[in-house]
Regions:
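Soluble cytosolic regulatory domains appended to membrane proteins
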Residues: 2-160
Length: 160
């Protein structure tokens, strides 16, 4: 058969293999999704800023933990003066561990004292490239910024 010359040939080969029962449906879909991801930008997959959950930096550990647990997310952006000023990421496990180990910290310490650095990515970045970077650097959540540096949204490795 020789080498495949382009993406279309590989897609056709996968379709043929699927039709003949050589490739499972989920594998077939995954291969097609890989090709489609190559043309996809981060802005198309992100959670837009209007749908984001965040914690204000001056909230107590108890308040931050309560909000994060109610949201169902394990990582939540922490904002300073507003949504365009993200100062880090709060991990529920960090907040919970601190609150359990030091009960007084629940009400005396602020969320901003327990944030991890945020990763920022441009909204016009290719999703496939970001996926590789997130996998390589073990990043689960990134802040998506628009061309003016404002917060456009967030993206998780699961979104990609």
């Amino acid at each position: 058969m020789g080498l495949l010359s382009d993406e279309d040939e590989l897609r056709q080969l996968m379709d043929h293999a699927h039709t003949r029962g050589l490739v499972e449906s989920d594998e077939h879909e995954m291969i097609h999704n890989v090709f489609e991801l190559g043309d996809t930008l981060v802005r198309e997959l992100m959670v837009p800023r209007t749908d984001m959950v965040w914690i204000e930096k001056d909230k107590t550990l108890r308040q931050g933990l309560s909000l994060a647990l109610r949201s169902g997310y394990s990582r939540v952006p922490v904002v300073g003066d507003g949504i365009d000023n993200i100062i880090g990421i709060a991990y529920v496990k960090d907040l919970a561990k601190r609150a359990l180990d030091h009960h007084e910290a629940e009400t005396t310490e602020k969320v901003e004292q327990h944030t991890r650095p945020a990763v920022f990515v441009p909204e016009n970045k290719e999703a496939a490239e970001l996926l590789k970077e997130m996998q390589r650097d073990q990043i689960h959540l990134a802040i998506v910024v628009d061309e003016y540096g404002g917060t456009a949204g967030i993206i998780t490795i699961e979104d990609i």
